[in-house]
Regions:
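Helix-start (N-cap) detector for alpha-helical repeat units in TPR-like alpha-solenoids
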Residues: 2-4, 37-38, 71, 78, ...
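Conserved structural position within tetratricopeptide repeats
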Residues: 28-31, 62-65, 108-112, 143-146, ...
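Alpha-helical segment of the N-proximal tetratricopeptide repeat
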Residues: 2-32, 84-109, 113
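Structural motif corresponding to the intra-repeat A-B loop/turn of tetratricopeptide repeats
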Residues: 16, 50, 95-97, 131, ...
Length: 167
């Protein structure tokens, strides 16, 4: 069985909602053709959808190493790095670090890497709100709403922060 046949089996597994089996098929395709950047990229996407961020980054990096000029692979890796930063920021917040400075830095960096990362905007708004900086919290959440106008949580946060600003 060649790599393309295994990729086809991986897609069949995805359609059957068996992501672990899909990962196995992608890995077999890579074993057959280790220098095929597209296979690493496809496996990375599947890992990312399965919340296996470390492995997703690993294969996205490999895909980009194999095809340095591929902007799709570069953007995908940036999005994954943004997700890593959001995860790290959430850990900082959970640890209740002093005023969330590190979390703010990480979230802003995540937004630079992936300007469409709505979650990063919403968490950043919460961090500002925790510091009683409702003006910045409101501003950040409004940025999120400009990206996704019907996002319910963003609407709720914006209303809450706007109310706090009036008090």
């Amino acid at each position: 069985m060649n790599g393309e046949d295994q990729i086809q089996k991986a897609y069949e597994s995805i359609l059957g909602h068996d992501f672990e089996k899909a990962i196995e098929w992608f890995e077999k395709a890579i074993a057959a053709e280790p220098d095929n950047a597209a296979y690493h990229y496809k496996l990375s996407i599947t890992f990312a959808r399965s919340n296996k961020l470390f492995q997703a980054v690993e294969h996205a990096s490999k895909a980009l190493d194999l095809e340095r000029d591929n902007e799709v692979y570069r953007y995908h890796l940036q999005v994954l790095h943004a997700r890593e930063l959001v995860d790290r920021a959430q850990k900082e917040i959970s640890a209740k670090s002093e005023h969330g400075e590190r979390a703010i830095f990480l979230l802003k960096e995540a937004i630079v890497l992936d300007p469409l990362a709505i979650e990063a905007y919403l968490i950043l708004g919460e961090v500002f709100a925790l510091r009683n900086d409702y003006s910045r919290a409101y501003q950040v959440v409004m940025d999120a709403l400009r990206l996704e106008p019907n996002h319910e949580l963003a609407k709720q946060q914006a209303a809450r922060y706007q109310l706090k600003l009036k008090l």
